[in-house]
């Protein structure tokens, strides 16, 4: 997920003892709190990257 890459890095730096599974759960909860408008740029970028990958 495009959004989670940056967020995961930030959360891991802020919480170095947090396990990856806990980070994933927290990121999932945070993603659900975003509005559709906030999610849109990340969804669009994921679609673009998918299209580029399929083209190769």
Curated annotation (Swiss-Prot):
Q: Which Gene3D superfamilies match?
A: High mobility group box domain (1.10.30.10)
Which Gene Ontology biological process is one annotated for this entry? brain development
The yes or no answer to whether the keyword Acetylation is present is: no
Signal peptide coordinates: none
> Which Gene Ontology MF annotations are present?
DNA-binding transcription activator activity, RNA polymerase II-specific; RNA polymerase II cis-regulatory region sequence-specific DNA binding
Which cellular compartments is it found in?
Nucleus
Tell me if Transcription is a UniProt keyword of this record.
Answer: yes
What protein name is recorded for this chain?
Transcription factor SOX-1
- Residues covered by region (Disordered): 1-22
Originating organism? Pleurodeles waltl
Summarize which parts of the chain are annotated to bind DNA, as ranges: 1-56
Q: Which InterPro entries match?
A: HMG_box_dom, HMG_box_dom_sf, SRY-related_HMG-box_TF-like
From start to end residue, where is composition biased (Basic residues)?
1-10
**One GO CC annotation, please?**
nucleus
Per the entry, what this protein does is: Transcriptional activator.
